[in-house]
């Protein structure tokens, strides 16, 4: 990737998001403990003696909109078709998954039609078979599909809370590279898109070039 650079500082929350989104830098638990007890961390290189990136509660770089781009290729999208468009349907679905400790990430619900709707969600590829089996064995959901050719690309940065247009630039980068977005999830400091797995590396480079060049 072109024009990468080291961050001087990053917040605990930003580092936690990046770690959970596939950035292989720090273990989630280590950052959670550091945040809990407000202990600063420094990410160093074993090959280079220069100062590293400090992970702390508040940084001096809050004006920097985006702190990182991450990808996760361990993603499956499961879609349940033609479920009743009525109260309690989502509880029945995700209650079954929770009983099997299946971690659900992004959820997308279609607009209801003729009393029916479709619900899609993402989970790890390793949990996809279990999720399919649980849903079908319940006898309530038989029309279930699974797409195991997906990836998630995300941008993280606390600066997004006070600046508009970041999502637009991310989507523009993907559009310019003919990358289709299947699902979108946002929070105060994160935007994630589900795309085709074969496009993951290209997407990360395109987003980085759009937001950091």
Predicted regions and their residues:
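C-terminal catalytic "cap/lid" subdomain
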Residues: 1-213
């Amino acid at each position: 990737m072109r024009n990468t650079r080291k961050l001087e500082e990053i917040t605990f929350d930003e580092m936690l998001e990046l770690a959970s989104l596939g950035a292989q830098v720090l273990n989630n638990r280590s950052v959670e403990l550091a945040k809990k007890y407000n202990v600063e961390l420094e990410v160093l290189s074993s090959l280079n003696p220069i100062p590293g990136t400090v992970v702390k509660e508040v940084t001096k770089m809050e004006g920097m909109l985006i702190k990182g781009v991450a990808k996760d290729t361990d993603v499956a999208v499961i879609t349940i078709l033609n479920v009743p468009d009525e109260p309690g349907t989502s509880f029945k679905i995700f209650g079954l998954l929770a009983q099997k400790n299946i971690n659900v990430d992004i959820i997308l619900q279609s607009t209801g039609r003729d009393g029916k709707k479709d619900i899609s969600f993402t989970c790890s590829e390793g949990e996809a078979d279990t999720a399919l089996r649980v849903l079908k064995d319940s006898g309530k959901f038989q029309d279930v599909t699974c797409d195991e050719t997906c990836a998630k690309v995300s941008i993280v940065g606390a600066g997004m809370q006070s600046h508009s247009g970041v999502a637009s630039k991310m989507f523009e980068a993907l559009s310019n590279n003919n990358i289709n977005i299947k699902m979108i999830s946002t929070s105060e400091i994160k935007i994630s898109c589900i795309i085709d797995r074969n496009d993951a590396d290209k997407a990360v480079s395109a987003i980085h070039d759009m937001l950091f060049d």
